[in-house]
Swiss-Prot record:
It catalyses: Endohydrolysis of (1->4)-beta-D-glucosidic linkages in cellulose, lichenin and cereal beta-D-glucans; Endohydrolysis of (1->4)-beta-D-xylosidic linkages in xylans. This is Endoglucanase A. It comes from Ruminococcus albus. Coiled coil: none annotated. The active site is at residues 169, 293. Belongs to the glycosyl hydrolase 5 (cellulase A) family.
């Protein structure tokens, strides 16, 4: 199957993005322009320190234009910038975002946006207050609307290369169903928050009337039953954000009793099932999907196996629907927890060319 030439109209789309124009194209067409992505993880979504000092509190250096340029120039044309807002807002009912914080977020957004990247900003690590159950939903809904109204107003003049993702892994933290699809109550609360995000952003007008907005499922799950039980709002410019560390035994699990260190095509069935599920439930209904988080941890430098896995992952994402995939990079490669890092932010070089080159080569 011949892959589309996504570079064909590159100069035109870059000019339009920088002009601040939102083109008269469908959400499927916009997402179809994207190749592959990278997450600026554990930076603007870090917590535990006052004010803007939180950005470096989890061990990553302050984000620079040089970093983002290096990632974009490598071939990652989608830059997802996870942002935690909850620790940078005032009290109810206004929940005013700190001026210094939203200015810093905008500065980092501009690093990628000015390069011509597709930039995704979201609301990340908000689980302590964003609790999707009936006891908390009214207050959560109010705070969600207040935050997104301010963010949408701040960025309303940006072109269609800026994308808003309303919720990251919305779930009841610590509950038995946290990572197993939630409850009926929890899924209905997530539906409500998706709709509140959508309505709030659209009401700010300007380019936000047609901006691509990403909904999600409970915990951003790719489980078939969760996807089928998640409402799809009526809107011509939405897509879905899904997280898929598949298969978990290879990508994430560190339990030596049943984890996978090595990869071959005998495991491809799980990837085919994942992408087929997304195609049938979203793409076949003209709803685009972006896998906004995927990746495989470094297990004793198994880079060759990770390269084989990511080659298969991206191949099936492309062949079964043209789904852009955004690697979760938390900056950690050889020390610390969850070793998803592929880019060294201290030196602006790549920890592993083996994995990185496999991503870029298969996403063409």
């Amino acid at each position: 199957m011949r892959k589309p030439d996504k570079d064909a109209d590159r100069l035109t789309t870059l000019d339009l993005a920088r002009s601040g124009e939102v083109r008269d194209i469908s959400a499927m067409e916009l997402v179809g322009e994207m190749k592959t992505g990278w997450n600026l993880g554990n930076s603007l979504d870090a917590t535990g320190a006052p004010g803007n000092a939180s950005e470096v509190n989890w061990g990553n250096p302050k984000t620079t234009k040089e970093m983002i340029d290096a990632v974009y120039n490598k071939g990652f044309d989608v830059i997802r910038i996870p942002v935690t807002w909850g620790g940078h807002v005032g009290d109810a009912p206004d929940y005013k975002i700190d001026d210094e914080w939203i200015a810093r977020v905008q500065e980092v957004v501009n690093y990628a946006y000015d390069d011509g990247a597709y930039v995704i900003i979201n609301s990340h690590h908000e689980e302590d207050w964003r609790i999707p159950d009936n006891e908390h939903i009214d207050a959560v809904d109010e705070k969600t609307a207040a935050i997104w109204k301010q963010v949408a107003e701040r960025f309303k003049d940006y072109g269609d290369h800026l994308i808003f993702e309303g919720l990251n892994e919305p779930r009841v933290k610590g509950s038995p169903q946290e990572w197993n699809g939630g409850t009926e109550e929890g899924r209905r609360c997530v539906d409500r928050l998706n709709k509140t995000f959508l309505d709030t952003v659209r009401a700010t007008g300007g380019n936000n009337e047609k901006r691509l907005l990403l909904m999600t499922t409970y915990a951003s799950s790719s489980m078939s039953n969760v996807i089928k039980d998640t409402a799809i709002p009526e809107d011509d410019h939405i897509g879905f954000s899904i997280h898929a560390y598949t298969p978990y035994a290879f990508t994430y699990n560190a339990n030596a009793d049943w984890e996978l260190f090595h990869w071959d095509d005998s495991h491809d069935g799980e990837l085919v099932s994942l992408m087929t599920n997304l195609k049938e439930n979203y793409l076949d209904k003209d709803i685009p999907v972006i896998i906004t988080e995927y990746g495989a941890v470094n297990k004793d430098n198994n880079d060759e196996d990770r390269a084989k896995w990511v080659s298969s992952y991206i191949e099936y994402a492309e062949l079964l629907g043209g789904i852009p995939c955004v690697w979760w990079d938390n900056g950690y490669y050889s020390s610390g927890n969850e070793l998803f890092g592929i880019f060294d932010r201290n030196t602006c070089t790549w920890f592993t060319d083996t994995v990185t080159d496999a991503i870029i080569e298969n996403a063409k």
